[in-house]
Design a protein with these regions (language model features):
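A positively charged, amphipathic N-terminal helix/segment that binds anionic biomolecules
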Residues: 2-33
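Short, exposed beta-strand "edge-strand" segments with a Pro/Gly-rich flavor and a Y/T-containing core
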Residues: 1-7, 61-66
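Phosphate-binding site recognition
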Residues: 28-186
Length: 186
């Protein structure tokens, strides 16, 4: 193949050298496995967890959507005292489960929102990670947690009882959503 060369203008050489030195230093930190400390104001969750303003912003786009009949049952679950129960929303993909959850988040009072969280599960997450994040949320006083796409957890079926046996019995309201209705065994 042909050889192509690009020349850096003289007035940009020093800036480019500084950038290359920074990149080299950062690469060395990565190779050494250098872990940076998380600033104290940042909550260190292992998975995707939304709380506070992020949670409200996440829910905002569905504010004008019409509520479905099932919304009343979800709202009733959220309004009653927790009693060792977990609410499960299951159905086909793209049928509105997450939209329903977002609508419920929008309707939370300021006090409820301050103690609510949304967890987005990915295929790379494990039940152990979700468990650790739920424990962190419980320690910080969160009482209502929505866990979306929970059936993406490869070990979900084996450990599903964790949600009701550990967290719901301690007063946490859990709303789980997922696509594989056969995965819900409790």
């Amino acid at each position: 193949g042909k050889r192509r060369e690009l020349y850096v203008p003289r007035d940009e050489v020093e800036s480019l050298r500084e950038q290359l030195a920074l990149r080299k230093r950062l690469e060395q930190e990565l190779v050494k496995g250098g872990q940076r400390e998380v600033p104290p104001h940042v909550e260190a969750f292992e998975g995707s967890v939304l709380v506070g303003d992020e949670l409200r912003e996440f829910a905002a786009p569905v504010a004008s959507f019409k509520k479905r009949a099932l919304y009343g049952k979800l709202r009733a679950f959220l309004e009653r005292e927790p009693r060792d129960k977990v609410l499960v929303l299951c159905g086909l993909r793209r049928t509105g489960k997450t939209t329903l959850v977002r609508q419920a988040i929008l309707d939370l009072s300021s006090d409820e929102l301050a103690r609510a969280a949304f967890m987005q599960v990915t295929p790379f997450d494990t039940l152990a990670q979700v468990n650790r994040d739920l424990r962190k949320l419980a320690e910080r006083g969160y009482r209502t947690v929505f866990v979306d796409e929970v059936t993406l957890l490869s070990d979900f079926v084996e450990g599903a009882a964790l949600f009701s046996d550990v967290f719901a019995t301690r007063g946490m309201r859990l709303v789980l959503s997922g696509t594989d209705s056969l995965g819900f065994v409790f």
